[in-house]
Amino acid sequence: MILGFDTETCNGQLRVLASSSGHSISFAQNNYSLSDVETALKFLYEEGLAGDGYNVFWNINFDYSIILKPYIVEHEQELHDSRIAEIREKQRLALEQGNVTEHEADVYLRFQIGPYSLRLISHKGFVIKLKRKSVYFFDAANFYMSADDVHMSLDTAGERYLHVGKDEWGKKNRERMGSDPEFFDAHLSEITSYCIEDCKLTARLFEKTIESYRNLGLNFPEHPYSKASIFKQYLRDHETMTNCQNSYQTIKAAPIFRLIKDSYHGALNQIFGVGTFKNITDADINSAYPTAMRKLIDLTGAEMIV
């Protein structure tokens, strides 16, 4: 099962939060406060699917920044310091491995709002946790990219892949909805319906995503943060990750291993966790060296001679 979620705003404030189930909540203009943030999180937590199924937004960064806006404004310095601390930890790991990178993407932000624990993963999703239950939300737009490698709009993706666009009334009144509080209040029912239809379109597009991959014989991952999640699921299904470890142990035992390691100045994989880790394998479908990888020789069945 898939649930789509969406927000509607006016002058940068959350006014409507809805899901494809048809349920929604609304907030008064100029009155969205910290207590309302908890109300919104409660709606998402109780409405969202936990376990089997997926909860998806379209361009999730916008939605969670709007939902959390009062908290972000009040705790700006705290969140800034938290991000700095995690970036410094990444840099420390980079130094330990002989690599230093200025690219600080996908930093995890964790914080507490009322009884809810949140973890945000930039441009990919967020998790709401209460006691032992966690509800995950993902970005359906990550699977619909334009030729310029940017997210398609919901309207464009719907028309291209489902031959269904966004609601015409909403498209016609989009500007007034976003800037005129009196218009928003007068048409709250229509705007809520428009928001729910966007939720349904988001859910249908994500269903199309899953169907497309399954038609190729691929299992869809439990946590689809990005296209790389599909790739990693494929590797797990074919035990490629385990085979990589076996190959690595063979190479590591060779006398020339140190030369290989010392000459390597490529990408850096970072693990966010506490404790001792052994034999970690990771992979990413978006390689920085696609041309070189296409020229690699297939060494299946080869023997190493030292």
Q: Across the structure, where does each feature detected by a protein language model lie?
A:
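Gly/Thr-rich phosphate-binding beta-strand-loop-beta motif of the actin/hexokinase/Hsp70
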Residues: 1-20, 287
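Active-site-proximal helix-loop-helix substrate-binding element of RNase H-like nuclease domains
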Residues: 29, 53, 57-69, 73-203, ...
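Short secondary-structure boundary/capping segments
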Residues: 18-19, 69-82, 295-305
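RNase H-like nuclease fold core
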Residues: 11-30, 298
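Short, basic/hydrophobic alpha-helical segments
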Residues: 33-54
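Common nucleic-acid-contacting/processivity interface regions adjacent to the catalytic cores
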Residues: 11, 179-182, 186-306
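Short His-Asn-centered micro-motif
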Residues: 5-7, 34, 56-60, 139, ...
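Flexible, charged surface loops at secondary-structure boundaries
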Residues: 45-52, 131, 273-277
